[in-house]
Amino acid sequence: MLASVSEGLAKRTSKALLMSRVRVLVGTRKGAFVLTADGKRASWSIEGPHFPGWEIYHVKGSPVDPNRIYASQTSTWFGQVMQRSNDGGATWDVLGNTFAYDGVTGTHQWYDGTPHRWDFARVWHLEPSLHDPDTVYAGVEDAALFRSTDGGATWSELSALRTHGTASQWQPGAGGMCLHTILIDPQHPQRMYAAISAAGAFRSDDAGASWTPINRGLRSEQIPDHDAEVGHCVHRLALHPARPNVLFMQKHWDVMRSDDGGDMWYEISGNLPTDFGFPIDVHAHEPDTIYVVPITSDSYHYPPDGKLRVYRSRCGGNEWEPLTNGLPQRNCYVNVLRDAMAVDTLDACGIYFGTTGGSVYVSPDGGDRWDEIVRDLPAVLSVEVQTLA
């Protein structure tokens, strides 16, 4: 009897996996790619490149309507182009491409500490609304936050962030002064988080009307005042939707955690081989299980010892284990960028990441085993995943 019950459960689980689907949205230096599979995540269909030859900094789908996908297409020669798909990435429409700072822009600090005028360069990050497929936020370089409420046709700046009293002290990081992370609190819709290289992390409790720096506890040896209110090079923020007051951060150096919405941070780097890196993410069903990819240093943008290793903590930090099964463990000198890691929400949570060497990996079991979905793409800038019924 027990055997038949177990067999029945296994069959139902297998059927559910076959009926489920995942869609992985990959932005690269030379176009976007769409990878799809059933819930087993063993056999993949690869479509693309969409927008060949263009830098696709970010592609992300709406949590309300998974067929609604937004993409940032950019070129130093041709400028910024926004794209939208209403059919899951099969076809695309050009949207509004005007990003105008509101009012007098003022200045921020340049690399040498001199004043520098705000100049729009590109859209780094897109964050669709949790409730409305026509509302989407855009984080841009030079750092500012924009919003569209008409599906990307027009964009308006939420200027309270850029005009914050500390903005004149902000400086670009090595990749520019970019607003690269936008998080929306699913339990408190008025609360948002933004992260800027190299200004730090900020929180709004009124849907972007005002902002507070949330950098207490951060320490950065690279800036004159190591404990300054702003000026920290935050690489990425992450939260779990069931516990949005707990934030995780990958900083230029240091992996950090806050248990009070960013009011105070403490270090959780623990036994990592190096605490420099770019992405950080949280398991879909385990709020204390987090993932990072240690990189040797800010001078050597490749994994320690040429071994590509994701590290997992099951206790919210400090205690980390290397995840290597299926990943190259010799002569691997790639980087994993800040937007290039994502998780799905299937029962067996899948973890995904892409490399500057053009590989995209999946772990269908929370990191225990890795499979290479595709290789030899252009350098991967972003990875997002949609879990489809």
Across the structure, where does each feature detected by a protein language model lie?
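Extracellular glycan-interacting surfaces
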Residues: M1-A389
